[in-house]
Amino acid sequence: MIQLVAFLGNYGKEYEKTRHNVAWNFQDSLPFANKLSWQSKFKGEIASFSPEQLAQWACDTKIHSKKDGSPALVPEDAPSHIYFLKPQTYMNLSGESIIEVVNFYKLKPENVLVIHDELELPLGTVSLKWSGGLGGHNGLRSTKAVLNTPDFWRLRFGIGRPDNPNMNIADYVLSKFTTEQQEILQNVYSQTNLLLVKALLSKDPANLISQWGKKKLIDD
């Protein structure tokens, strides 16, 4: 099961609402975000909660529940805690924060879900992926380096490539979304809440890939 969710981004007000920080923006939008208690630790900010708490929050906020309206079932062998992490090392060194949590709590790479921006997916598309390439993403590169394997979960938010093919990619990912794009993303975030909850309460997130391997959440 997934035990650590790492939201990749850059720390600082100047990076708020930028394309590279789409994962942090997603975390901020979670209906149960105000339930999380953050601590500065492991070169980042970390919050922990039990799967049972998550199931109750998802039920209370109408993200996910059983047909009778009660909280979703938690697998019998679920871990006692799930951890949310926002590395504050800047994107290129995200792995330094992730590996501290992995080592401290004795996690395995398959227990890790990294949420990040994805140039190769259009805006409005999300993708749950196991392992694979890095797509030139420095946060993923850092994570692979410290885990010594590409075999970890990824939840990718499409940001698309710049309209101007000559635009520097570093400048593009550090630029802010337009107001219209932010409105689109709020819709995307609200639909992706269900995926995140299901992935964290699932014994095997691979069962979700057929539906969420590459899902377009907005109309053209």
Functional labels for PLM-detected ranges:
Residues 136-139:
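Hydrophobic alpha-helical segments within soluble ligand-binding/sensing domains
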Residues 1-131, 141-155, 162-168, 175, ...:
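Nucleotide and nucleotide-moiety/phosphate-recognizing core
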